[in-house]
Each structure stands twice: as C-alpha cells, then as structure tokens.
From Swiss-Prot:
Domain BPL/LPL catalytic as annotated: residue spans: 54-240
Subcellular location: Cytoplasm
Upper lineage: Bacteria, Bacillati, Cyanobacteriota, Cyanophyceae, Synechococcales
Gene Ontology molecular function: lipoyl(octanoyl) transferase activity
Keywords for the protein's UniProt record, in alphabetical order: Acyltransferase, Cytoplasm, Transferase
A Pfam short name: LplA-B_cat
GO biological process: protein modification process
Organism of provenance: Synechococcus sp. (strain WH7803)
Pathway: Protein modification; protein lipoylation via endogenous pathway; protein N(6)-(lipoyl)lysine from octanoyl-[acyl-carrier-protein]: step 1/2
The family this protein is said to belong to: Belongs to the LipB family.
A single cellular component GO annotation: cytoplasm
Location (main, coarse): cytoplasm
Designated name of the protein: Octanoyltransferase
Top-level taxon in the UniProt lineage: Bacteria
C-alpha cells in the first residue's frame, strides 16, 4: 500500500501564518492530563485576548491515550454497553459535543487549541476543516476518505476511521479528532460509537498494513498547517506544554 511521501500540497482557506506550538509527547498521556493541558492553554488564549497585548501562540497536541472512554456533554449513557459504575476502562464525561467514543494506543488524537477569531468564527466551518485535515492525510496514503451527509467524522469504505468532537469557549477551541491508525478495535465493542448503531469502525492499518502512528503524525502536521494557515513550531518543553510556565 502507499506510504507517506513528503509534504501535502493543499490549499488553505483560513488564516495567514498563525503561530502555534506543536507538542508531540512520546509517551501515552492519560486523558485527564491532556484535557488539563488544553484547558490551561485555552485560559491563556482567553487572557491574552482580554489583555489587548500581543496574542499568545495557539497550540496543537498530537498524542495517544491509554484505553479510556469519553462522553460528550449531552451524550446518552444508553450508548454504553457496560455498567457506568464499573467501566472496563476509565470513563470521563467531558465538555465536548458528540456521543461516546473510545481511545486506545495506536489511535492518534489531535487536539488543536485555536482562537477562531484568527481563522473563522464558525463552528460548522471548523468541523468541516477538521474532517478535511483527515481526508488530506488519507489522500497522502493513497486512500479516499469520505464524509457522510448529516454526520461528523471521516469514513473509509463505510467504516468510520476518525471521530470528531470539539469544545469551544469564546471561540477558543479544545478537544478535536481521534484517528484510528493501528489501534485494537475491541474497546469499541463495549459502546455504540458516536451513538451510531450498526455502523462499523475501522483502522487505517486495515488498508495500509504495518502503518504506525509515527508515520501519520507528519502528514497531520502538514494538513493542519495547510488547512488552518498555521506556522507550527515543535516544542518539547514539558513545562510549557503542561502550563507550568509560558
């Protein structure tokens, strides 16, 4: 199967070179820890907007979680096929849209904390751009990703490979995309993924055997930079990523 080769050539219809730190932890990051990082950065952007000074950089995290489940703000526990008091992995109700999803190693999670005032203050546009990022990545792998009318996410051959759910406060985003690269899918059998009964879930490695997250990450960076007009600056400083210093 085709493999990642070089940079994507895509046309951005958003900002013009907005600065953004890129954090790519090499270790598995517990969900609550990553959620805390996003909220701290969101607060930083909000305070920067209120101060009237130079705007702080935006931020993007690309990482993997240990097994867990997350429920969106209004998600129904009817879509859990287990007792929520005794989940098979940690269960979190969080401040994003959407229903229940599963996270696990081998799934690349993309968390952009962006100020949509620098791009476009339109959540429908933002969700479609996140879908397009995934579609661009799949195209670089020689795969044809598809949308389904009325739903959010990206599918391959009717199998959902990317779930999308976001939170937004005063146009500052958090949460984002969960892209199944080479994760085990058994955890999805304990829920109705995204509340969509009867729809299959897949991994990119089903179409590209041997594919690893490390091969997909640079493609995601290229697509994010192109679609959102970001100047991504890799930053390995854990203190900055975790909000302990700026």
């Amino acid at each position: 199967m085709p493999r990642p080769i070089g940079n994507l050539e895509t046309t951005t219809d958003s900002g013009t070179g907005s600065a953004a730190f890129l954090f790519q932890p090499a270790h598995l990051v517990p969900f609550v820890q990553a959620w805390t990082w996003q909220r701290l950065w969101q607060e930083r952007l909000l305070k920067g907007a209120d101060s009237g000074g130079d705007p702080p950089p935006e931020a993007v995290w690309l990482l993997q979680h240990p097994p867990c489940y997350t429920l969106g703000r209004g998600a129904s526990e009817d879509h859990l096929l287990f007792d929520p008091e005794h989940p098979p992995a940690p269960l979190h109700r969080i401040d994003r849209g959407g229903e229940v999803t599963h996270h696990a190693p081998g799934q690349l999670v993309i968390y952009p904390v962006l100020d949509l005032h620098r791009h476009r203050t339109d959540l429908h546009w933002y969700l479609r751009q996140l879908e397009q990022v995934v579609i661009d990545v799949l195209a670089a792998l020689g795969l044809r990703g598809e949308r389904i009318e009325g739903l959010t996410g990206v599918w391959l051959d009717q199998c959902k490979v990317a779930a999308i759910g976001v939170g937004c406060r005063r146009w500052i985003t958090q949460h984002g995309v969960a892209l199944n690269v080479n994760c085990a899918l058994e955890g999805f059998e304990s829920v109705v993924p995204c509340g969509l009964a009867g729809r299959a879930v897949g991994c990119l490695s089903d179409w590209c055997p041997g594919l690893h997250v490390s091969e997909v990450q640079p493609l995601v960076c290229d697509a994010l930079a192109a679609r959102f007009g970001l100047c991504l600056e890799p930053n390995a400083d854990a203190a900055i990523a975790e909000g302990r210093c700026w």
